Amino acid sequence: GRMITPTDLPALTPDITTLYFGGISLCNIPAADTYLALAERETSKCVIMLDPNIRPGFITDEAAYRTRLSAIFAVADIIKVSDEDLEWLIPGTADIMSKLAQLQAGRQAVMILTCGKDGARALLPDGTDVAVSVPPAVVVDTVGAGDTFNAGVLAHLHSEQSLTKAAIRQLRGAHMTKALEFGAKVAAVTVARAGANPPWRHEISDA
């Protein structure tokens, strides 16, 4: 909940290897500062994925929010933004991949960009740029699509023994392409259903 504080945080057990942060949980204190503290506390041990999923209507203090995002960007291993997120983070006329590279600058992070029906791209730590298209889908409800995409990417990396801090820094284009494709595939199932209703793995072909 939004009232969680650092004293509420438990010690993480060794089997927890990845933490995912995002959405409106980063907008309001004390929860937002608590989640930032957790990311900073665990960054040496866990893979950190961030999807800010920026919702300007929920932001009550833009300066503080931008500062908080910068701090969690600094400890994240995988940063996923939408084209709309990126335009909010880096306003201006530069092309979208230049903005993604600007956001990545100085970090050893995998940057993922989702562009709705135009697919998804990733910029790897070595500068490799990969892109995938979105599989055909009958859109019923887009609620949960982004979270499902992110879960699919993480699940695929985990299945390939690539969900470690060292492995992420050494990801190759072919491996990232497969992860993006799996994320897009599971998200396509979610949008074809009413509500936030992601698929089970056995529902996904070639999983």
Please state what every model-predicted region is:
Residues G1-V130, S162, I204:
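Ribokinase/PfkB-type carbohydrate-kinase core domain
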Residues G92-A207:
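Conserved phosphate-binding/catalytic region of the ribokinase-like
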